[in-house]
């Protein structure tokens, strides 16, 4: 950090800044927000997030990355990404996998990640189903990293550890007939010895989802705020947003101050980078609407109009077309409705359909 005085901005300025930073103007086919990957939850939704920015999934690889969730990343990045996501120390490693089912095993810290990554490498030498890999890896790691599953009548490795260690095991995450298939990445790399590049990830979060607090960045990484203190970047400016403070790279201050009004209408899938910000009350102040959008299971996508989330949407395939149902939080203007027709067609094309049917509720 430096001595630059704190600046005060409005919520609207922050949202305009994020919309501009994340490439919703479709000015580039390689949006910078790919530095954070694009979460592919539910499966197949990440290409919709990319299309909202004028990009495609060409040249991208699907891996388990942040918090063990499936993300699309540039195919050239897995080795560097693995080094950046490798826990900073034992305490950080324990925080990332701490769960009731492996309370003692989590205390192994970095060793838990290393032994699991090595088990992945010995197991995944060809495409295998996730269940088959889980069985083999579970048998190869210390018992303290597994738990008894009564319905299965077997011990399973903690899912939180399993998916976070997959990238370190140089594993690609695919799908075949609706089932997860794991296979070796095309360009294998060694298990990281130490973390490297974590500070760049922190800076990327602050650039695309800032201003943000240390706690918000830590939550995105799946760890505790104290863990990332050693990699908290220099060159940040404190920003007060309607009284709440966060941090932004000094290089982005002018972009924040001069962020233009956003006019685009976009359909964002549930895992869209814009929705990954941990300050949900800033994105959507109404608590009831927050609950409607960010559901633990089966949540809808978000309708972005300008810089505001104005509703939710869902899509389902019906023959050779896709039916897109939009539910506005309030009445949608005629211009937004017209734009939604185009965006619904974009969703249909991404999903391989020829036609879109838009319903607005």
Language-model-derived ranges and their functions:
Residues 236-288:
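Non-catalytic regulatory appendages
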Residues 132-138, 214-218, 307:
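A short acidic, leucine-rich amphipathic alpha-helix
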Residues 210-256:
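Anionic-ligand-binding alpha/beta catalytic cores of soluble enzymes and soluble regulatory domains
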Residues 1-147:
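Phosphate-backbone binding and catalysis cores of DNA-processing enzymes
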Residues 151-230:
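Loop-centered beta-sheet repeat module
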Residues 113-117, 130, 134, 158, ...:
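Short, leucine-enriched amphipathic alpha-helices that occur as contiguous helical runs
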Residues 58-65, 167-175, 236-241, 311:
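A short, conserved structural fragment
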Residues 287, 292-361:
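Glycine-rich, small/acidic residue-mixed loop/short-helix segments
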């Amino acid at each position: 950090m430096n001595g630059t005085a704190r600046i005060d901005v409005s919520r609207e300025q922050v949202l305009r800044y994020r919309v501009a930073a994340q490439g919703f103007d479709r000015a580039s086919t390689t949006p910078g927000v790919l530095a954070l990957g694009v979460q592919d939850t539910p499966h197949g939704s990440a290409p919709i997030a990319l299309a909202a920015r004028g990009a495609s999934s060409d040249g991208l690889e699907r891996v388990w990355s942040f918090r063990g969730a499936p993300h699309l990343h540039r195919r050239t990045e897995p080795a560097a990404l693995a080094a950046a996501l490798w826990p900073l120390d034992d305490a950080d490693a324990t925080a990332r996998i701490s769960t009731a089912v492996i309370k003692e095993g989590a205390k192994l810290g970095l060793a838990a990640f290393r032994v699991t990554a090595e088990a992945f490498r010995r197991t995944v030498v060809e495409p295998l189903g996730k269940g088959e890999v889980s069985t083999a890896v579970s048998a190869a790691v210390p018992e303290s990293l597994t738990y008894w599953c009564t319905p299965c009548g077997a011990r399973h490795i903690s899912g939180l550890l399993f998916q976070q260690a997959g990238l370190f095991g140089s594993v690609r995450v695919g799908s075949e007939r609706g089932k997860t298939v794991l296979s070796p990445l095309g360009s294998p790399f060694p298990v990281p010895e130490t973390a490297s590049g974590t500070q760049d990830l922190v800076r990327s979060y602050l650039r695309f989802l800032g201003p943000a607090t240390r706690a918000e960045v830590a939550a995105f990484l799946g760890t505790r705020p104290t863990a990332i203190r050693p990699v908290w970047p220099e060159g940040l400016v404190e920003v007060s947003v309607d009284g709440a403070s966060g941090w932004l790279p000094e290089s982005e201050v002018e972009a924040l101050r001069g962020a233009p009004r956003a006019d685009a209408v976009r359909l964002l899938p549930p895992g869209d980078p814009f929705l990954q910000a941990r300050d949900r009350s800033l994105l959507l102040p109404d608590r009831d609407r927050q609950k409607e959008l960010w559901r633990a299971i089966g949540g809808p996508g978000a309708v972005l109009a300008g810089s505001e989330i104005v509703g939710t949407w869902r899509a389902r395939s019906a023959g050779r077309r896709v039916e897109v149902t939009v539910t506005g939080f309030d009445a949608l203007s005629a211009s937004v409705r017209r734009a939604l027709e185009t965006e619904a067609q974009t969703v249909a094309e991404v999903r391989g359909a020829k036609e879109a049917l838009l319903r607005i509720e």
